[in-house]
Amino acid sequence: MNYTQEMNLVSKSGYCMPFEEKKGEVNLTLGYGKQIHPVTQEEFFHHGVDFATHRYILTAVADGVVSGIGSTPTHGLYQVIRYGKYEVTYAHLANALAPFGARVRAGSVVSISGDLLHIEVKYDGEEINPMEFLAMLYGNLLAMRQQGHPD
């Protein structure tokens, strides 16, 4: 996907990363794209990224609306939050705290992760690499700090 300025996420309430690292770091256990399955050793396309988490508090990254909550055999409990043209899915959750239809702001607690957090991101219906989305969020946070806004 070619990224443009219009793809920058705009949020009146500011920006927040989806979780705070408890000990200063969190391990990425599975990246986006072609991967080797850790159990079967077969190649497959991973549509998101996985982090090793254990009951992490997950927060809204910007102004948004909870647009989906459900459960599948593959991803367990999941929650979808729409931020403008972005749609972010948190999966393998222990609990979804923000109900369907809830309006959220940056930093609002929305769910609790399980031992693993799977994140998928779509922009205008097209799947994108979640790490690029997280990098954009981090860039927005840095820009706000430089302008003197609190986190």
PLM feature spans:
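Surface-exposed, glycine-biased beta-strand/turn segments
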Residues: 1-77, 105-106, 143-145, 149-151
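Conserved, short, structured surface segments that act as functional micro-motifs
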Residues: 28, 77-82, 100-151
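Zn2+-dependent peptidoglycan hydrolase active-site motif and core
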Residues: 44-47, 60-97, 115-121
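Short acidic/polar mixed-charge low-complexity motifs
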Residues: 56, 86-87, 126
